[in-house]
Design a protein with these regions (language model features):
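Short, exposed "boundary/linker" segments that immediately precede the start
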Residues: 1-5
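Structured mid-domain segments that build the active-site/substrate or prosthetic-cofactor binding neighborhood
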Residues: 199
Length: 626
């Protein structure tokens, strides 16, 4: 109640020739006794109050607020009556005294105040309010702290931005663009709503709120994390994984495991630094990318076969331990932003392993990164694998070529020996991911892959002004050798205005031209060419992979367990029979089939149609092996 607090200054009755400021209840009660002796007061309204007794019971005996405090008349050094100053100071000064008033400082808790070292409760670590508090609370906190301690009152400050509608307009009932937060929480949950708001804009920036963004966050981040945990739980239950085995040393784990654990520890460091520097947006975005792009879309997808069937090998245990560690740490990292889902994930994981001593993620210690597990070279190699795979898959989409259709070859120009070494280390991962048989390295691609170069006027103009046209003309004259040299070094020096000018990669745009039978893509310094010719042998293997996909879907439709063995019957078709016969063992192995029979006519009511290729439809019967 700021308006009820009195201004503690007292002035003498002769227009304030004498004044004093009362600094404590003890000083006030002592002044009252003198006033009674001088005849200005007849009784002590704070009778029974014991100076120095800081108990709540003692302070309940007195009331220092208006109007009671106005009945107190004190005595000046010269014997004049002194009355409370009736004027008001800015009421925000009352709020500015909060750091001291909340702990009854300096009369109690002095050990909590050490501005010189910054330890204790003062100065505060963090404060957040609207920008209007620049002249209000923010100012009075600093003003009082400066007067008392010659110190700042807080170390970090955020002025919250506004929540606007998706078009950047202020929300209002009149315009009909206001979003009801309670119905949004009811529909999507508080964690997805909070995650969207934190990751979509920095807290100090205005947020253009779009409910479709909340839907996307719930689907893409929380949905992906939920599916990743479900995948883990499904196979962990099958194999009765409880993390009871001895921990496999990270150095002895497969490269894929070491990579994701390296990324995890890099993530722990980045998220910890982000929270420490009050940048939750950076933390949330890093966690989202790790979960969706690296953990789910890369590690789990490339590791799936390690969890399927087979013996409980060291490789399978490593896969379980690695995924468990990632999920557990993600729960801890996301807890400040998504407290409810993080706690659910944490407790579910702890039921599996029981390795965590705390009942809640909010009681657990924040993760600490292990520098020895961070392998930047391995991260770079896997980044190449991800980029190249993404480029090739994009080329497949461009050609409307299904990933299940194997292709023969990719060609990759080699810029330097180190790049070739890194590419070779992840070659098999790339080939498996994009379903291509082999890679050919080109040490001199100039005669095979043709490139074009164009000046980037957006960067050249601000950098070089009047020289831009001359520089652009020189760039347009580059041949294949100059382009190759530019790509290799990342820069190129020309002469313009009779002066040497060094161009950076951002100053040009390099494009690749397709060659007959191939399609080509370039991203940064990486170029790939994909052979799009499909031989008869590749066609047959593609058909076999289509059968595998359709059979797996039928297993799911029939609610088979992942460990159930099956028997397959396929109706003959002139365009698919050879593929089934040639790749029978492969189809059976991939679908857990103990047998596969081709039949002229499949009459079972449980048989299902399957479109294997355009205008190629046959029947498949999937039965559980009894």
């Amino acid at each position: 109640h700021r308006d009820l607090h009195s201004f503690p200054t007292r002035r003498s009755s002769d227009l304030g020739s004498e004044e004093t400021c009362i600094g404590s209840a003890e000083e006030l009660t002592a002044g009252i006794e003198k006033s009674i002796e001088a005849g200005f007061m007849t009784e002590n309204p704070y009778e029974g109050f014991v100076a120095g007794d800081n108990s709540k019971e003692n302070y309940n005996k007195i009331d220092l607020h208006k109007p009671y405090i106005d009945k107190v008349v004190l005595v000046s050094p010269s014997g004049k009556p002194m009355y409370r100053e009736p004027d008001l100071i800015d009421v925000w000064f009352d709020s500015g005294a909060m750091p001291y008033a909340q702990h009854h400082y300096p009369f109690e808790n002095s050990e909590k105040y050490n501005p010189a070292t910054g330890k204790g409760v003062f100065p505060a670590d963090f404060i957040a309010e609207g920008v209007d508090q620049t002249r209000g609370w923010f100012f009075t906190l600093h003003a009082i702290a400066t007067m008392i301690d010659e110190s700042v009152a807080f170390k970090n400050i955020i002025s919250n931005g506004l929540v606007l509608d998706k078009n950047g307009n202020k929300m209002s009932k009149r315009l009909g663009n206001a979003v009801d937060p309670f119905s949004s929480i009811e529909k999507y949950g508080s964690d997805p709503l909070r995650w969207y708001m934190i990751t979509n804009a920095q807290p100090w920036d205005n947020l253009k709120f779009d409910i479709e963004g909340v839907e996307e966050v719930k689907r893409k981040f929380f949905g992906t994390l939920y599916n990743t945990y479900n995948f883990f739980a499904l196979y962990a239950n099958v194999d009765e994984f409880r993390y009871s085995e001895a921990e496999i040393p990270v150095a002895q784990r497969p490269e894929l495991d070491r990579w994701i654990l390296s990324l995890l520890n890099s993530l722990i460091r980045e998220v910890g630094d982000s929270y420490e520097s009050y940048e939750p947006t950076r933390a949330g975005r890093a966690i989202s990318e790790f979960v969706t792009e690296n953990l789910s879309n890369w590690f789990v997808r490339l590791s799936r076969k390690r969890y399927w069937g087979g013996e409980y090998s060291t490789d399978k245990i490593s896969a379980y331990q690695t995924l468990f560690t990632c999920l557990l740490n993600v729960a801890k990292l996301m807890a400040p932003i998504a407290p409810f889902y993080a706690d659910l994930l944490y407790t579910d994981l702890n039921r599996v392993a029981g390795s965590e001593p705390d009942q809640s993620v909010h009681l657990a210690d924040f993760p600490v990164f292990d520098e020895t597990l961070i392998d930047k070279d391995l991260e770079e190699k896997m980044d190449i694998a991800q980029k190249v795979s993404s480029m090739i898959l994009a080329l497949r989409r461009k050609e409307k070529q299904k990933v299940r259709q194997p292709l023969a070859k990719i060609m990759v120009p080699v810029l330097n020996p180190h790049f070739r070494e890194q590419f070779e280390a992840v070659k098999n991962i790339i080939l498996a991911e994009v379903n291509v048989k082999e890679v050919e390295y080109l040490t001199d691609a100039a005669g095979i892959i043709k490139k074009k170069i164009k000046p980037n006027f957006k960067t050249l103009g601000p950098k070089y002004g009047k020289l831009m046209k001359e520089i652009a003309g020189a760039i347009n004259q580059f041949g294949q050798a100059e382009i190759a040299a530019f790509e290799t070094s990342g820069s190129y020096t020309i002469t313009a205005g009779n002066e040497p000018v060094t161009l950076a990669a951002e100053d040009v745009e390099i494009q690749t031209e397709d060659i007959p039978g191939w399609i080509v893509a370039t991203e940064g310094q990486i170029t790939v060419a994909l052979d799009i010719n499909v031989t008869e042998e590749l066609k047959l293997e593609g058909i076999a992979r289509e059968f595998i996909n359709k059979i797996q879907n039928l297993r799911k439709d029939n609610n088979f367990e992942v460990t159930d063995r099956i028997v397959l019957t396929i109706q003959k078709h002139e365009k698919t029979d050879e593929a089934v016969i040639r790749h029978k063992d492969y189809i059976c192995a991939q679908t857990l089939a103990n047998g596969l029979e081709l039949t002229d006519k499949l009459n079972s009511p449980n048989a299902r149609e399957a479109e294997i290729d355009k205008d190629v439809v046959t029947l498949i019967l999937v039965e559980r092996q009894l």
